[in-house]
């Protein structure tokens, strides 16, 4: 008797999902550090869905944006919950994104060039999306953050000033800026979603790394039910943690200054972005020259794109003690940069920021080429 194949293997659309998420051959020794990718997918969908409901009640106008946020919080049924899930979900998304990138660096996953480059592109687009979302509540930090960050474009020779005024839609941040940021903040997550699918396709065509860094083609197991059940358990745990934060301290990841309505006549004592951009902000302000600070910030992201091209290695070297020392030094330095970014600009933090900026580039360059150093020693 001929046994009919399951529908998931024959249907022209369902079999694509089946090959990516169900019958996917997966190395049998993946650790919990390989969970972040699936969690990122879930925590990308959550802000998209909640953002759709928020957009139904938000008004992108200078005189109404701040009031519309409070309208959502107080008047819309469960609006407060939708907003807090959206905001804290975005913070969790960036936590998982940094952990996902750190795992990729630790296990030298950037030798999968297409996968790594698309992943870095997703990170950049996510940064742009989150920045625009930070502006929409139209609080004090929203206004002055938009003014400071968009002003960086004035460092572009000849075109800079015109480009800034074109983005603003005038001679200062105003209604046109808010409208444009609202539209882009709505559209960009769908671009991230499309890039994530391409990221998955390239990853599964090349195969994944594993903790040992060895070829795992000899023994693989299907993704479902072995890893899908593990991912689901971890997802439920993290969802519980997020809900505890939402019900206990929903403003944990937010700045208190942004609870004040935007005021062009009053500047905050310390203008700073969301916590997940503080490390980049430290690099920007560590250089006393405006152009130098912007270039430093650009190169800090660009160097991630260049990792597959500047690295010299023949196999995974995450087992090396030198590499472990370099990697964890890099992690500690990133945490220091993040901490300094939230501190006021005083001589002590300026010196620490400049030192940490220098170490950021030095460590990442040595780490990417440490295999050569080991071979030569």
Curated annotation (Swiss-Prot):
Disulfide bonds: none
Binding site for heme b b566: 100, 199
Record-listed heme b b562 binding positions: 86, 185
Binding site for a ubiquinone: 204
One BP term from GO: mitochondrial electron transport, ubiquinol to cytochrome c
InterPro entries attached to this UniProt entry: Cyt_b/b6_C (IPR005798), Cyt_b/b6_C_sf (IPR036150), Cyt_b/b6_N (IPR005797), Cytb/b6-like_sf (IPR027387), Cytochrome_b (IPR030689), Cytochrome_b_C_euk/bac (IPR048260), Cytochrome_b_N_euk/bac (IPR048259), Di-haem_cyt_TM (IPR016174)
Cofactor binding comment, as recorded: Binds 2 heme b groups non-covalently.
Pfam families: Cytochrom_B_C, Cytochrome_B
GO molecular function: metal ion binding; ubiquinol-cytochrome-c reductase activity
Key word Ribonucleoprotein present: no
Membrane topology field: Multi-pass membrane protein
Alphabetical list of Gene3D superfamilies matching this protein: Cytochrome Bc1 Complex, Chain C
UniProtKB keywords: Electron transport, Heme, Iron, Membrane, Metal-binding, Mitochondrion, Mitochondrion inner membrane, Respiratory chain, Transmembrane, Transmembrane helix, Transport, Ubiquinone
Obligatory cofactor(s): heme b
Transmembrane domains' residue ranges: 36-56, 80-102, 115-135, 181-201, 227-247, 291-311, 326-346, 354-374
Function of the protein: Component of the ubiquinol-cytochrome c reductase complex (complex III or cytochrome b-c1 complex) that is part of the mitochondrial respiratory chain. The b-c1 complex mediates electron transfer from ubiquinol to cytochrome c. Contributes to the generation of a proton gradient across the mitochondrial membrane that is then used for ATP synthesis.
Family classification: Belongs to the cytochrome b family.
Assembly, per entry: The main subunits of complex b-c1 are: cytochrome b, cytochrome c1 and the Rieske protein.
Protein's name in the database: Cytochrome b
Species per Swiss-Prot/TrEMBL record: Myzostoma seymourcollegiorum (Polychaete worm)
Species lineage: Eukaryota, Metazoa, Spiralia, Lophotrochozoa, Annelida
Gene: mt:Cyt-b
């Amino acid at each position: 008797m001929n046994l009919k194949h399951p529908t998931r293997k024959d249907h022209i659309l369902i079999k694509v999902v089946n090959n990516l998420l169900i019958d996917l051959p997966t190395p049998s020794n993946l650790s919990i550090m390989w969970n972040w990718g699936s969690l990122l997918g879930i925590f990308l969908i959550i802000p998209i869905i909640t953002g759709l409901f928020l957009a139904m009640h938000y008004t992108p106008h200078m005189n109404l944006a701040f009031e519309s946020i409070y309208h959502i919080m107080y008047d819309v049924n469960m609006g407060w919950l939708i907003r807090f899930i959206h905001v804290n979900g975005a913070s969790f998304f960036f936590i998982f994104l940094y952990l996902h990138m750190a795992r990729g660096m630790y296990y030298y996953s950037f030798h999968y060039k297409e996968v790594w480059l698309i992943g870095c592109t997703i990170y950049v687009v996510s940064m742009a999306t989150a920045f625009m979302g930070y502006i929409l509540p139209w609080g004090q930090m929203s206004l002055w953050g938009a003014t400071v960050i968009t002003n960086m474009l004035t460092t572009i020779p000849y075109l800079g000033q015109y480009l800034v005024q074109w983005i603003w839609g005038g001679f200062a941040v105003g209604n046109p800026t808010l409208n444009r940021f609202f539209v882009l903040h709505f559209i960009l997550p769908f671009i991230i979603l499309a890039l994530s699918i391409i990221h998955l396709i390239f990853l599964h065509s090349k195969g994944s790394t594993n903790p040992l860094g060895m070829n795992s083609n000899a023994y693989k197991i299907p993704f479902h039910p072995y890893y899908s059940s593990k991912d689901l358990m971890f997802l439920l745990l993290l969802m519980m943690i997020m809900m505890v934060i939402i019900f206990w301290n929903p403003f944990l990841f937010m700045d208190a200054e942004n609870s004040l309505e935007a005021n062009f006549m009053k500047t905050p004592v310390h203008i700073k972005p969301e916590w997940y951009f503080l490390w980049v902000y430290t690099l920007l302000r560590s250089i006393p020259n405006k152009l130098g600070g912007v270039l430093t910030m650009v190169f800090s992201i660009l160097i991630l794109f260049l990792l597959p091209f500047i690295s010299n290695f023949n196999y995974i070297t995450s087992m090396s003690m030198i590499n472990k020392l370099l990697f964890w030094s890099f992690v500690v330095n990133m945490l220091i940069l993040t901490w300094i970014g939230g501190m006021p600009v005083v001589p002590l933090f300026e010196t620490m920021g400049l030192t940490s900026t220098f170490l950021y580039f030095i460590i990442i360059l040595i780490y990417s080429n440490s295999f050569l150093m080991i071979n030569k020693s």
